[in-house]
């Protein structure tokens, strides 16, 4: 303490006690307050990491939990209190302390109180007697040692010497008592024992008074006269004699006074304890008046039990809700067995679908691994709760009173509890090809957050002997990743303070489809699908209806619809193949039959088909044109063969005798046939003749392509070399007749190569080192520049037309009035039917 006082008295360090920069931060402000949701990190093994060596390589035994406790602490309710409430708390604590001290004093028996009163009276009598004796001795000392220079002052040295001499004498008396036989002494008079008692009791207080006299600092007391030590020695000798006489008395009565001294010591201890309690009460009163001194560390530390009691007085107790934050899988048993099936639990099933999980797990599967399917099944708990909710709604909503405010904490936490339970209504089964792929997915995805949804993936292995008899709510075996769009959502119960109940929430996919902007064609298709149906579909539905069982859920109907769609597509493909085969058969036959089915919009569809056929001839690709040419060649060959066979039949062999009557008749028949053929040809219409001429012209063109002898091979590299030669070398090659002249002319207007002028893929770069300048290349570049100029002119003209036609309304294509009236009538009838249905429900 003395060293600290010296440091504080030093002027160099005096600023430390007053400057707040040198004050230590209290623990409440030093640690970061965290919510009780994160208390698992203090005891959970996932957050614990033991250190064997520190950063300098020295061996230590340290863990991360110690670091967490060093920097983090659970939030106390005191941190949220205001200043006025904290004052009220301090006052209550002081009052409670006073009450406790009063209760302790009252709890003592009245016999003990009487004993204390008697002891106190004895102490007071002994103190008075000692005071009288001490005052007489002091007067004797003053009378015997009167000096001219010092009147009423005692030197500290003399007082110390006198005390030491007294102590020595008392020690000798104690030794004499101990040395006496059997350690027992008899007292003759009771007065002497009383004197001994009074002297022993008052010993402690007399010592205190003498020490106070010695410690008194006085300048006059230090400046003593030279004769003072002699006088002090005389006075000390006289005092020693008096003490010897007293010592004899005490030695005679020592044995009888031992018991009394022990009692007196106990009384002194009781008295000291009472004084300490009174001092503590005074200090507490002072603290309550002045308040806690936080700068000196007073009032900082308070017991948690007192804080809780005080808070319980201020705030009424509320029903506690312990949510399983990130601990929904704490009850799941742990097993070492790895299987090829995984269960996905505790997810937001109102938003997630099977295809979302399949897309996720496909991105985490190992090389060569396959995820066959993902199916979502309802759990037993979910089935029971959903049945109850269909009848009376969620139980948690019924427990909330109607008059409860919107921001009521208890009602909000009840809704949160319901949302947590709703995560267990379903579970998904992921089927993999092998246990290795399942374990890889488990290691990578278990505990992972799905996007930014605040819902964490809880994976568990499913034993091989477990089977699932329920029909799945949703299933997915394939996902088109090119067209798949991920879902971005946040579950309110897990991530926000405000809770939104999802019991009667509309399907989010339905909301997105309704909010999407549709085109006119899409709307018409939707109207056709919704309001118009063929009779065959109705019959199929009627046939399939009795096969199903009663009480089929909506989810089962969805799966059946998907199966029906697949079957319908297969049936359509089969019908198309049959129609194609029938058409081919009918084309071969002479008698043609036609079937006409009246369908809404048949006229428009027929017109479109005709246009497509007419435009198809112009839009044929080079390959299709080549195939058509081949077909025409085959047809020509067949015709030539037929003509040759007819000619061979017409030819008459040389061995035949025309004079023979049999052969003469046959020759006449052949002549008649030829005449009939000629007459048939003559009777042909002019239209047939024109068609025949066209066919002949096309055939001539085809034959010309094959019969052209002007075709020749060329070497492009040699042409480029000869073109870049000098004039002398060209003349030399001309003489030798080895110069290759580039007679090839590019057909720039060929429609097959129009992409060279429009597409960036066929761009010609003259700065490229592989570019070789020829006449054909120059023509292509010129044509490209011409196309570019034409395009710019067209754009300018289009802009001018748009500016002129801004005021003119766009002409709409007229729709078939009969079809539009049919759709409108069906719409009106459905609206009327729904309106009547609503009125009945009300």
Swiss-Prot record:
What tissue specificity does the UniProt entry give? Ubiquitously expressed.
Subunit details = Interacts with ABT1. Forms a complex with ABT1 and suppresses the ABT1-induced activation of polymerase II-directed transcription in mammalian cells. Disrupts the interaction between ABT1 and TATA-binding protein (TBP), and suppresses the ABT1-induced activation of polymerase II-directed basal transcription in vitro.
Q: Where is this region: Disordered?
A: 54-317, 534-568, 631-657, 674-693, 785-816
Q: Which stretches does UniProt call biased (Basic residues)?
A: 631-641
Q: Which residues form a coiled coil?
A: 772-804
The Gene Ontology CC terms held by the record are:
nucleolus; nucleoplasm
| UniProt xrefs under InterPro entries | Esf1 (IPR039754), NUC153 (IPR012580), RRM_ESF1 (IPR056750)
Compositionally biased spans, kind Acidic residues = 228-250, 258-290, 304-316, 536-553, 646-657
Write down which residues bear the modification named N-acetylserine: 2
Q: What does this protein do?
A: May constitute a novel regulatory system for basal transcription. Negatively regulates ABT1.
Q: Which residues carry this modification: Phosphoserine?
A: 75, 77, 79, 82, 135, 155, 180, 198, 288, 290, 304-305, 605, 648, 654, 686, 726
- Which UniProt keywords are listed? Acetylation, Coiled coil, Nucleus, Phosphoprotein, Transcription, Transcription regulation
This protein is called ESF1 homolog
Matches recorded under Pfam families: NUC153, RRM_ESF1
Q: Where is the composition biased (Basic and acidic residues)?
A: 64-73, 84-94, 102-128, 148-164, 555-564, 785-795
- Native source organism of the sequence: Rattus norvegicus
Q: What is the lineage of its organism?
A: Eukaryota, Metazoa, Chordata, Craniata, Vertebrata
An example GO biological process term is: rRNA processing
Compartments, as annotated in UniProt = Nucleus, Nucleolus; Nucleus, Nucleoplasm
Q: Which family does it belong to?
A: Belongs to the ESF1 family.
């Amino acid at each position: 303490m003395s060293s600290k006082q010296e440091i504080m008295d030093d002027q160099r360090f005096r600023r430390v006690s007053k400057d707040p920069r040198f004050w230590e931060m209290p623990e409440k402000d030093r640690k970061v307050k965290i919510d009780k949701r994160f208390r698992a990190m203090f005891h959970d093994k996932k957050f614990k990491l033991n250190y064997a060596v520190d950063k300098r390589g020295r061996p230590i035994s340290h863990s991360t939990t110690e670091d967490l406790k060093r920097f983090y602490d659970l939030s106390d309710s005191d941190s949220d209190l205001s200043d006025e409430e904290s004052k009220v708390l301090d006052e209550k604590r002081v009052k409670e302390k006073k009450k406790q001290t009063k209760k302790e004093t009252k709890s003592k028996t009245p016999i003990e109180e009487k004993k204390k009163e008697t002891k106190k009276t004895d102490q007071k009598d002994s103190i008075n007697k000692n005071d009288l004796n001490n005052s007489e001795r002091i007067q004797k000392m003053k009378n015997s040692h009167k000096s001219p220079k010092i009147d009423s002052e005692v030197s500290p040295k003399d007082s110390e010497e006198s005390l030491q001499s007294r102590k020595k004498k008392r020690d000798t008396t104690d030794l004499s008592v101990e040395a006496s036989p059997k350690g027992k002494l008899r007292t003759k008079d009771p007065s002497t024992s009383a004197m001994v008692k009074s002297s022993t009791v008052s010993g402690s207080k007399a010592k205190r008074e003498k020490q106070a006299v010695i410690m008194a600092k006085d300048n006059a007391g230090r400046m003593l006269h030279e004769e003072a030590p002699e006088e002090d020695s005389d006075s000390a000798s006289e005092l020693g004699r008096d003490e010897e006489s007293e010592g004899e008395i005490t030695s005679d009565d020592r044995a009888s006074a031992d018991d009394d001294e022990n009692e007196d010591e106990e009384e002194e201890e009781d008295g000291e304890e009472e004084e300490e309690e009174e001092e503590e009460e005074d200090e507490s009163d002072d603290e309550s008046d002045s308040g806690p001194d936080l700068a000196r560390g007073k009032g900082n530390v308070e017991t948690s039990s007192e804080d809780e009691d005080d808070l319980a007085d201020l705030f009424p107790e509320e029903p506690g809700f312990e949510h399983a934050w990130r601990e929904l899988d704490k009850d799941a048993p742990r097993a070492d067995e790895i299987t090829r099936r995984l269960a996905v639990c505790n997810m937001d099933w109102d938003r997630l679908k099977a295809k979302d999980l399949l897309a996720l797990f496909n991105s985490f599967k190992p090389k060569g691994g396959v995820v066959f399917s993902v199916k979502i099944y309802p759990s037993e708990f979910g089935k029971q709760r959903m049945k109850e909710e269909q009848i009376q709604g969620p139980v948690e909503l019924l427990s909330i009173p109607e008059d409860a405010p919107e921001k009521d904490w208890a009602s909000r936490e009840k809704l949160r509890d319901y949302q947590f339970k709703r995560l267990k209504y379903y579970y998904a089964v992921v089927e993999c090809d092998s246990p290795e792929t399942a374990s890889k997915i488990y290691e990578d995805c278990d505990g992972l957050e799905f996007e930014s949804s605040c819902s964490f993936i809880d994976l568990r292995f499913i034993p091989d002997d477990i089977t699932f008899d329920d029909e799945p709510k949703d299933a997915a075996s394939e996902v088109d990743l090119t067209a798949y769009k991920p879902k971005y959502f946040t579950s309110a119960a897990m991530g926000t303070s405000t809770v939104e109940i999802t019991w009667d929430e509309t399907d989010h996919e339905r909301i997105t489809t309704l909010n999407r902007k549709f085109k006119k064609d899409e709307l018409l298709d939707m109207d056709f699908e919704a309001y118009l149906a063929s009779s065959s579909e109705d019959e199929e539905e009627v046939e399939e209806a009795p096969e199903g069982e009663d009480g089929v859920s909506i989810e089962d109907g969805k799966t059946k619809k998907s199966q029906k769609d697949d079957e319908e597509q297969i049936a359509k493909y089969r019908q198309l193949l049959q129609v194609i085969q029938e058409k081919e058969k009918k084309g071969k036959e002479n008698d043609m039959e036609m079937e006409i089915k009246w369908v809404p919009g048949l006229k428009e569809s027929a017109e479109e088909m005709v246009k497509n056929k007419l435009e198809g001839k112009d839009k044929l690709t080079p390959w299709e044109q080549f195939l058509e040419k081949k077909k025409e060649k085959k047809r020509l060959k067949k015709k030539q063969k037929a003509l040759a066979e007819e000619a061979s039949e017409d030819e008459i062999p040389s061995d035949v005798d025309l004079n023979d009557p049999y052969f003469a008749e046959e020759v006449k028949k052949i002549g008649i046939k030829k005449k009939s053929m000629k007459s048939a040809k003559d009777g042909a219409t002019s239209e047939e003749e024109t068609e025949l001429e066209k066919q002949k012209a096309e055939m001539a063109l085809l034959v010309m392509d094959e019969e052209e002898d002007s075709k020749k091979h060329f070497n492009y590299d040699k042409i480029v070399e000869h073109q870049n030669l000098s004039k002398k070398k060209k003349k030399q090659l001309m003489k030798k007749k080895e110069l290759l002249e580039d007679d090839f002319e590019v057909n720039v207007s060929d429609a097959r190569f129009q992409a060279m002028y429009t597409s960036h893929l066929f761009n010609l770069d003259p700065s490229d080192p592989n570019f070789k300048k020829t006449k054909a290349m120059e023509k292509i570049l010129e044509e490209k520049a011409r196309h570019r100029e034409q395009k710019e002119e067209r754009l300018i003209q289009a802009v001018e037309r748009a500016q002129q036609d801004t005021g003119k309304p766009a002409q709409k294509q007229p729709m078939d009035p009969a079809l539009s009236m049919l759709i409108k009538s069906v719409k009106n009838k459905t609206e009327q039917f729904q309106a009547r249905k609503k009125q009945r429900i009300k």
